[in-house]
């Protein structure tokens, strides 16, 4: 992994005698010695943020929070399925969760980045913009993810989905900094990606001898939860912020009274992200074996009890995506995900197969990674749908939007590049050949321990399969009457209205004929269950 990705990054430290373990050992920090303070007079959350801003002089040049384009641009319906190119289910499951992250999707659909970035090749933001745009605007199709999305990560075998997820998030974060390569770590933590996924921990140690307080602030992009002794996400969070007593051999060397004395240590959230990525630690760091236990997680999660300022009212998050692993090790088995489309319907995204699901099914999974968004943000997106506002076309003229983009361009790191022509933007969506991936897959392919396509062999009686994967062995065994009702959606297929008028479904025989038209996508079969 990249050294400044994943869990804790660079730190802001107050009284440097207390220091959290950081994945960036070279991170710079500020030191402020604080003498004994009254118990009820800690720095306020706002004061801490102001101090942090002072440590990041170019922060407002990277991605101003007040100018983050979060207006709704997403289509209401579910988008495309993703083709499995050989042991890439972990890639597909992670990409679907990111695709249905509202703030990220809205920013990508605005094409703000591609209009100002001059390094399309090797830029993860440009690559993700092309992928999200294609996925959301091609419902009923199966698309192939670009090789560039997993370049430098995929080695022809299955990898850990959470590691790939954070690899991608970290690469997007770095893509925000091409014009500010010399900025300090604090400024890097103000990028657009950090504004969406990032927040700050506060680790506070209080000396019980002189009552001196030492605070350390660390940025995060995701939160790892120990589930060994937890039955729910709330219990895991409570354990994470539970005060720890430091005494005896673990006594604290106070930087205020300069004595070795008993102390209390508490880890809390100074600021919480717009989008929370909660990873349940299901795999052993040594053996990779899985902790296969049910851990309850809610549809709505109040994060206020885990904040540094716990008495300021509810801070409610709503679930919008779940990444699931089926199997016994992080290096085998199968990954898939559940996502919540803008209209509020849940869907199971299993490679090429997109199936309507229910919240009951979503909440009954052995989840690996949970995605929550602040309720106020989700309701704002849902409100635009309920009012019947259709998403604007990508090239639509909008005075307010253009004004906002103009303000952002003056502060964005990729500002000096000329605006791209349409064919240059389209070029970013083109994919190179997959021969290299297939070659690596054949050379390194290991025989699976079980048939990963039979993870869920049965379908609920009221399920609606929007499009069907090529892996139909499980359905043939459990739903032969449904398998026989597949609609042939080749290039000669009648229109949707004609099919509904006739009321008949043709049997799918053989593979669908490839379309010869430019930029055509293969159609998917439609399965209707009574």
UniProtKB/Swiss-Prot annotation:
Basic and acidic residues bias locations: 382-392, 398-412
Keyword Cell division found: no
Comp. bias intervals (Basic residues): 510-524
Residues spanning the membrane: none
UniProt record, GO biological process: protein deubiquitination; proteolysis; regulation of apoptotic process; regulation of protein stability
Molecular function in Gene Ontology: cysteine-type deubiquitinase activity
Catalyses which reaction(s): Thiol-dependent hydrolysis of ester, thioester, amide, peptide and isopeptide bonds formed by the C-terminal Gly of ubiquitin (a 76-residue protein attached to proteins as an intracellular targeting signal)
Keywords of this entry: Endoplasmic reticulum, Hydrolase, Nucleus, Protease, Thiol protease, Ubl conjugation pathway
Enzyme Commission numbers on file: 3.4.19.12
Biased composition (Polar residues): 493-505
Protease listed as a keyword: yes
Main EC class the enzyme belongs to: hydrolase
InterPro entries: HABP4_PAIRBP1-bd (IPR006861), Papain-like_cys_pep_sf (IPR038765), Peptidase_C19 (IPR050164), Peptidase_C19_UCH (IPR001394), USP_CS (IPR018200), USP_dom (IPR028889)
Major location (coarse): nucleus
Similarity comment: family membership: Belongs to the peptidase C19 family. USP17 subfamily.
Stated name of the protein: Ubiquitin carboxyl-terminal hydrolase 17-like protein 21
Organism, as annotated: Homo sapiens (Human)
Lineage: Eukaryota, Metazoa, Chordata, Craniata, Vertebrata
